[in-house]
């Protein structure tokens, strides 16, 4: 019997940061963009094209989905779509964090530390 492949492919920076932003709460697009910038300490600025293109691909891949939660229209724009991370998305994020942890361990063993960088995606 063939062993089931449970390994997740490495994530793009955009997908990683979107999953990270959704890991603690459901959010709409603009809020995700702001959380990406905050989570990266201002080093990653995600534009709407990258965000919504990535969201579409992530929904198709089953990493995120639209939230069933209805927002109070008096508190928020009812046209906003909120997104949530799925079980598969949580597993993919955990696998990516494990990869990063392994890379960091190797870099620490080699006494290699990255320079500060900033980029747009």
What residue ranges belong to the model's regions?
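Exposed loop/turn and edge beta-strand positions of beta-sandwich/beta-sheet ligand-binding modules
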Residues: 79
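Short, Lys/Arg-enriched N-terminal segment that forms or immediately precedes the first helix
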Residues: 1-8
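N-terminal helix-turn-helix DNA-binding core of bacterial DNA-binding proteins
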Residues: 9-50
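Amphipathic alpha-helical dimerization/coiled-coil segments
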Residues: 88-121
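Basic amphipathic alpha-helical segments that dock to polyanions
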Residues: 51-58
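Beta-hairpin "wing" of winged helix-turn-helix
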Residues: 61-76
């Amino acid at each position: 019997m063939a062993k089931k492949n449970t390994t997740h492919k490495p994530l793009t920076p955009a997908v990683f940061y979107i999953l990270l932003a959704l890991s603690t709460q459901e959010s709409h697009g603009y809020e995700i963009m702001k959380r990406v910038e905050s989570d990266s300490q201002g080093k990653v600025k995600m534009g709407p094209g990258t965000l919504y293109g990535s969201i579409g691909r992530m929904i198709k891949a089953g990493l995120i989905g639209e939230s069933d939660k209805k927002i109070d229209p008096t508190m928020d724009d009812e046209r906003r779509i909120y997104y949530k991370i799925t079980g598969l998305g949580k597993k993919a994020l955990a696998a990516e964090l494990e990869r990063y942890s392994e890379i960091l361990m190797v870099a620490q063993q080699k006494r290699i530390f990255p320079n500060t960088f900033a980029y747009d995606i």
